[in-house]
């Protein structure tokens, strides 16, 4: 394994809600692919501890989803806060991609980046300023070639590592059926 500036860093966060001023990160996962979307390594999947008071602020959808997946219990049991999760993630990424080289990759990744900027600024700064957002291709396909949309189905577990794997697979699907490389 050696750091390669062409590798891509994929990330997904699970949060208590969508507002970084009010809500918090409760899970983070990363993986690294090469430029052809082959998964090279999966980083740690970390439940980020939050207080019972913070968890009580979740809306009904988040309570149902994160309780059903077991994430709420993992968050309560976790001993890792934001900073510890950030450092563990950075330690993994530094083995695979030099700082400032990979765009931040994922689905609706701008939302995740807002939370990173607020709660994990060192990790946020590790990425290039560009985005590789799979949801952009989905939106374009919806408008320009809607017949391909039914060809890829997500499981929607709302577990960070599952979601990242699906994002990589979804981009590969669009590469084959929409971009046609």
From Swiss-Prot:
Keyword check for Acyltransferase: no
Exonuclease domain: residues covered: 8-171
Active site: 129
The protein, known as: Oligoribonuclease
Record-level GO BP terms: DNA metabolic process
Known function: 3'-to-5' exoribonuclease specific for small oligoribonucleotides.
Enzyme class: hydrolase
Keyword check for Manganese: no
Keywords: Cytoplasm, Exonuclease, Hydrolase, Nuclease
CDD domains to which the protein is assigned, alphabetical: Orn (cd06135)
GO molecular function (one): 3'-5'-RNA exonuclease activity
